[in-house]
Amino acid sequence: MEYKRVLVKFSGEALSGNSGFGIDVKILEYIAGEIKSLVDNQIEVGIVIGGGNIIRGVSAAQGGIIRRTSGDYMGMLATVINAVAMQEALEYLGVDVRVQSALEIKEVCESYIYRRAIRHLEKGRVVVFGAGTGNPFFTTDSAATLRAVEIGADVIIKATKVDGVYDKDPHKFSDAKMLESISYDEALRDHIKVMDDTAIALAKDNKLPILVCNMFREGNLLDLLKYKKGICSIVK
């Protein structure tokens, strides 16, 4: 299958580098370069970034002072910060890009309108979707799947720090084996750590494949989408 329109999802933590917090500009530029390689090959790209490098709603609410709903809204705002940073990095590399937010912040970015997002993609612009779904209690993984379905993406790319889905944690077990392919039902049954169950269930309902790959393997995204030779696991 030829992938003409894709949704790339990666975590906010990926932007923070070794510090674990904030935005590492070198990593930001590297990721923007990987996205640019897709655009240069006529692949339409939407992006969803998490906000964990700034704040996580669940973590913020653990002490009881901040309510979960407020914590989640704080997390949504964090994703907008990351989206604006990615916009700047892509524009620095000469890529035309728009940020659309599920929460209205008209001085900073466009509000999310799916028809407008599709029009941007058709014109060759990258669209970075911020503020998750706009609702608390939903993860950015769920937001990524929702946006992918809405814009008619051919596939979701879940870009991580590992090469794919493993039978056990590769950071803890040296004999962990990567799975080239896994069904939606298997992913839901085993509660794989790559995406949450809500996101996987939505992908299943819409027959949307999920490619899980290592975003720090340079050139891998383009290899996967254009040359069908990259390293990944596929959930379908």
From Swiss-Prot:
Disulfide bonds: none annotated. Residues 17-22 are annotated as: Involved in allosteric activation by GTP. UMP binds at G51, D72, T133, G134, N135, P136, F137, F138, T139, T140. One of its GO terms (cellular component) is cytosol. InterPro entries: AceGlu_kinase-like_sf (IPR036393), Asp/Glu/Uridylate_kinase (IPR001048), Uridylate_kinase (IPR011817), Uridylate_kinase_bac (IPR015963). Keywords: Allosteric enzyme, ATP-binding, Cytoplasm, Kinase, Nucleotide-binding, Pyrimidine biosynthesis, Transferase. One of its GO terms (molecular function) is UMP kinase activity. Its EC number is 2.7.4.22. Pathway: Pyrimidine metabolism; CTP biosynthesis via de novo pathway; UDP from UMP (UMPK route): step 1/1. Catalyzes the reversible phosphorylation of UMP to UDP. Homohexamer. NCBIfam families: pyrH_bact. HAMAP family: PyrH_B. This is Uridylate kinase.
